[in-house]
Swiss-Prot record:
Gene that produces this protein: Srpx
The keyword Methyltransferase appears for this protein: no
Record: glycosylation sites: 34
Gene3D superfamilies xref list: Complement Module, domain 1
Descriptive protein name: Sushi-repeat-containing protein SRPX
GO CC annotation: autophagosome; endoplasmic reticulum
Domain HYR: 177-259
Length: 464
């Protein structure tokens, strides 16, 4: 057994007071790894620098960042008390916390730091479109814009979240640049209706369609609308539609109208021609008449037929041949029905002054009489020496007497009677009448108004 003086249980009471005194004497020196801050006491020769090369704080590791530490002067360990560390985040990450950490006496660094991935502002969803991103709005995420059908992308299609937390390029938008679609109908050539120069043409109005939102704001038609009567010729029809973006779509087509024609007819010599419609188109009717003193021979009217040939025969105007050999006055008047007007001048003797003066005035106004289809009939004398004369033709005394009796013309005095084309007694005179007064009367007759229009078209006039 060993010496009793070396037994531990015997030495402990003697050593313990010495250890306590030692701890009391050196409180400013600290203990490596204790975390206690040393006291700066000039009276103690132990210096803080004694522990400057002793690991103190835990090593720093920053995810997605780099740490650059500087140990206290003369030190080696970069976790010693007083070590300063600069923190830098890698590209695309940003520092949250202090950019410089100091190893403190409490064995803790002066701050907690973290490198977080940078994030760009959330992109605005474009109207009528959208976008798709690889990694949301984080750094280096790539987003691609797209547009709904009918819309066109305006701006950059692809943007990337950059290191400055901004997106590359400007935000894109979706605009309606595509014009609306419209399809016009196909209208075949049309033939004008009978006796007309037009034809009614109808079609279904085209319906436009917008490729974007399907909404059209306006439809404009240039040309005649469907259901109109189109005249002969080539007609351009144009439809224009607009969408809400003011894009326009247009379609065009033509309506061609053809008039079937028989060829122009001419008025007969010494006659008139009055035609309906355009005068030679399918269904047109041409009516013919002759000037005073002439009779119509041939067809009084001709029609342009579907085979483009005129009906009837070609008319002509022949000088009127009055038959004075008829047996009755009525038969004589029938020859003038709807052809001529009559001015019957009756006198008991050729020496009658009123008769002679009146006949002289009528001879000077012969053009006006012919223009108004007036035939002068002279009844001179008293039966049985009565003479009836129509220009160069002499009627029998008995026929002349019948005419006086039929029209109730006085036998023994000067008298004049105006008879219209329907055989009606229109006016009587017992004294002289000027040609102008006579013409003014005749010009009021219903048939005369139509004649005046035709004569004006033909250029037939007189100075009286």
């Amino acid at each position: 057994m060993g010496s009793p003086g070396l037994r531990p249980e015997l030495l402990l009471p003697q050593v313990l007071p010495l250890l306590l005194a030692l701890l009391h004497v050196l409180p400013s020196q600290g203990f490596p790894g204790s975390g206690d801050s040393p006291l700066e006491d000039d009276g103690v020769w132990y210096s803080h620098s004694l522990y400057k090369d002793t690991p103190w704080c835990s090593p720093i590791k920053v995810k997605y960042g780099d740490v650059y530490c500087r140990a206290p002067p003369g030190g080696y360990y970069k976790t010693a008390l007083g070590t300063r560390c600069d923190i830098r985040c890698r590209k695309g990450y940003e520092l949250h916390g202090s950019s410089q950490l100091i190893c403190q006496s409490n064995k803790r660094w002066s701050d907690k730091v973290i490198c977080k991935q940078k994030r760009c502002p959330t992109l605005t969803m474009p109207a009528n479109g959208g976008f798709k991103c690889v990694d949301g709005a984080y750094f280096n995420s790539r987003c691609e814009y797209y547009c709904s059908p009918g819309y066109t992308l305006k701006g950059e299609r692809t943007v990337t979240c950059m290191d400055n937390k901004a997106w590359s390029g400007r935000p894109a938008s979706c605009v309606d640049l595509e014009p609306p679609r419209i399809k016009c109908p196909s209208v075949k050539e049309r033939i004008a209706e009978p006796n007309k120069l037009t034809v009614r043409v109808s079609w279904e109005s085209p319906e436009g369609r917008d490729t974007a939102d399907g909404i059209l704001t306006d439809v404009i038609l240039k040309g005649l609308p469907p259901g109109s009567n189109f005249p002969e010729g080539d007609h351009k029809i144009e439809y224009t539609v607009y969408d809400r973006a003011e894009n326009k779509g247009t379609c065009k087509f033509r309506v061609k109208v053809r008039v079937r024609r028989c060829g122009k007819l001419n008025a007969p010599e010494n006659g008139y021609m009055k035609c309906s419609s355009d005068g030679d188109n399918y269904g047109a009717t041409c009516e013919f008449s002759c000037i005073g003193g002439y009779e119509l021979q041939g067809s009084p009217a001709r029609v342009c037929q579907s085979n483009l040939a005129w009906s009837g025969t070609e008319p002509s105007c022949a000088a009127m041949n009055v038959n004075v050999g008829v047996r009755t006055a009525a038969a004589l008047l029938d020859q003038f029905y709807e052809k001529r007007r009559l001015l019957i001048v009756s006198t008991p003797t050729a020496r009658n002054l009123l008769y002679r003066l009146q006949l002289g005035m009528l001879q000077q106004a012969q053009c006006g009489l012919d223009l108004r289809h007036v035939t002068v009939v002279e009844l001179v004398g008293v039966f049985p020496t009565l003479i009836g004369r129509i220009r160069a033709k002499i009627m029998p005394p008995a026929l002349a007497l019948q005419l006086r009796l039929l029209l109730r013309i006085p036998l023994y005095s000067f008298s004049m009677v105006v008879v219209d084309k329907h055989g009606m007694d229109k006016e009587r005179y017992v004294s002289l009448v000027t040609p102008m007064a006579l013409f003014n009367l005749i010009d009021t007759f219903p048939l005369r108004k139509e004649e005046m229009i035709l004569q004006a078209e033909m250029g037939q006039t007189c100075n009286v």
